[in-house]
Amino acid sequence: MDQIRQLAQWIKEANTIAVLTGAGMSTESGIPDFRSENGLYAQEDNVEYYLSEYYYKKDPVDFWRRFKRMFSLKMMGGFAPNDGHRFLRWLEEMGKTVTILTQNIDGLHTKAGSTNVIELHGTLQTATCPSCGNKYDLSFINRHEVPRCEKCQTIVKPDVVLFGGLVPRMEEAFAAAAASDLLLAMGTSLEVAPVNQIPFYVAAESPATRKVLINKTATRMDGMFDLVIYGGIGKTVASVRKQIQAE
């Protein structure tokens, strides 16, 4: 059985599907990733320093200047979900219980209509005042070079997990992954902890859960998966959907 037919069969057999997505999920929407030759790490110096909790506290004015520049494309909005995002919504329409565990901060899974999305690294869509808790949307953030709380004038903080910060919903993600019949990892290099521990956790806690990786390139964790498909997400899921519909 070829890989596409195998994955289609496993999806049909699964009732509960957990999907771990990374930056490669959104590149087909025109959003750059972090680690490719054209990604953020190649375009900017010291990314992990300037996007850290430490630097936000040290120099919040320069932090925002750099943050807005690094994420200018995302901050402008206008990006649309791609075939990969829509495929996950389609799985829900098939009657599957789908939980998306995303490392992305672009909000495209929700835009595509997925109903159960755990944004592990937060979202670009909002920022919060660390002093009084007031929350502000993207239009407010973009109107101000350095966004300050209207109530107390504190410089607000983006609702993304900065380097050195805690990932607040990890326990929920581990539980959802272990409770699934099928774990799909899509468009992720599996380089970032603690998210990259999810396949290990599933293997230990739920050995019957099938684990599948779809990615353009090999990762250091390929050996953790029952099935690895190398290729673009859009093309791969189109083939899988066609196979499911044909059977």
UniProtKB/Swiss-Prot annotation:
Catalytic activity of the protein: N(6)-acetyl-L-lysyl-[protein] + NAD(+) + H2O = 2''-O-acetyl-ADP-D-ribose + nicotinamide + L-lysyl-[protein]
Chief site of localization: cytoplasm
Binding site for nicotinamide: F34, I105, D106
Domain Deacetylase sirtuin-type: 1-247
EC number: 2.3.1.286
Annotated positions binding Zn(2+): C129, C132, C149, C152
Domain of life of the organism encoding this protein: Bacteria
Gene Ontology terms, MF aspect: histone deacetylase activity, NAD-dependent; NAD+ binding; zinc ion binding
Cofactor: Zn(2+)
Binding site for NAD(+): A23, T27, F34, R35, Q103, I105, D106, H121, T188, S189, N215, I233
Entry's cofactor comment: Binds 1 zinc ion per subunit.
Keywords per UniProt: Cytoplasm, Metal-binding, NAD, Transferase, Zinc
Entry's localization field: Cytoplasm
Active-site residues annotated for this sequence: H121 (proton acceptor)
GO CC annotation terms, alphabetical: cytoplasm
Its biological purpose: NAD-dependent protein deacetylase which modulates the activities of several enzymes which are inactive in their acetylated form.
Family: Belongs to the sirtuin family. Class U subfamily.
Protein's recorded name: NAD-dependent protein deacetylase 2
Record organism: Geobacillus kaustophilus (strain HTA426)
Gene (UniProt): cobB2
